[in-house]
């Protein structure tokens, strides 16, 4: 059965574990049609445009 050769120090363990809990920043771009912030490669929820085409009908 596999057994570790040496004990892992507390700082090494915490450093490795800290990467699990690190948050990932979400890239936010501006909609070229209305200028509102939106997620990339997704339809704008404010105007309904994606890639210069009307995809969703948004009631104002």
UniProtKB/Swiss-Prot annotation:
InterPro entries: Ribosomal_bL32, Ribosomal_bL32_bact, Ribosomal_zn-bd. Pfam families: Ribosomal_L32p. One of its GO terms (cellular component) is large ribosomal subunit. GO terms for molecular function: structural constituent of ribosome. Keywords: Ribonucleoprotein, Ribosomal protein. It comes from the Bacteria. One of its GO terms (biological process) is translation. Belongs to the bacterial ribosomal protein bL32 family. This is Large ribosomal subunit protein bL32.
